[in-house]
Amino acid sequence: MMNKKGREQDKMIVLAGMIGVGKSSFTEMIARKLGTEAFYEEVDNNPILDKFYEDPKRWAFSLQIYFLNKRFRSIKQALHDANNVLDRSIYEDALFTRVNNMQGNISDVDLDIYNDLLANMMQEIDSLPKKAPDLLIYLDASFDTILAHIKKRGRSYEQVDNDPELLEYYELLYSQYEKWYEDYNYSPKIKISVDEYDIVENPENEEKVMEIITNALEEARKN
């Protein structure tokens, strides 16, 4: 568990990564180990998500606006409280919107509207006393691992069986993540391989993962 010094140092950590990579599992573990609050992406109460998978051209823009609003609220609360872990954040939102534009699910006009709204939100975030996370953790895994995780968690609308268009969406999204991570510059960042450090099937990896995260936080505080 966290020592007294750790408790005195508030921290905000955001996770990022492909659908199905394991963000919620890592978020729960990190929050538990650090004694912080976990913020999870809403799935079960999302009124649009399953509709998007059924008809992405009809619902992609609405879904991204829905997520943007929710994540804007979450990031403001998290930056205000400054002692928490988020399993996804506003910093990734534009990636999903851009991929949907590339696939023709979101028009260029709607993409411009979205980007303008996002820019306004980021400007407001920049005016807050705490402007960015202390650390972003990008979870990486092979595409086969991603598909295995999606299949295992069993959400019917996420399954690629007999749905080549959904598989293409996953493949395109997956292909864009490495550059997104390279371009991310709002805060210190690290990459953790879920293939190497699987904490679900191998809980003994938790301590090594926390060592990596703790070292990254300490290094970030020096700079």
Regions found by a protein language model. Give the residues of each.
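Hydrophobic positions on the alpha1 helix immediately C-terminal to the Walker A/P-loop
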Residues: F26, I30
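Conserved substrate/cofactor phosphate-moiety recognition/catalytic segment
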Residues: R32-R71, L95-V99
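Conserved lysine of the Walker
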Residues: K23
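A glycine- and Lys/Arg-enriched "phosphate-lid" helix/loop adjacent to the NTP-binding pocket
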Residues: F96-S175
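P-loop (Walker A) phosphate-binding loop of NTP-binding proteins
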Residues: M18
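Phosphate-binding P-loop
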Residues: M2-D10
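NTP-dependent small-molecule kinase module
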Residues: K151-N223
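Hydrophobic anchor at the beta1->P-loop junction of P-loop NTPases
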Residues: L15
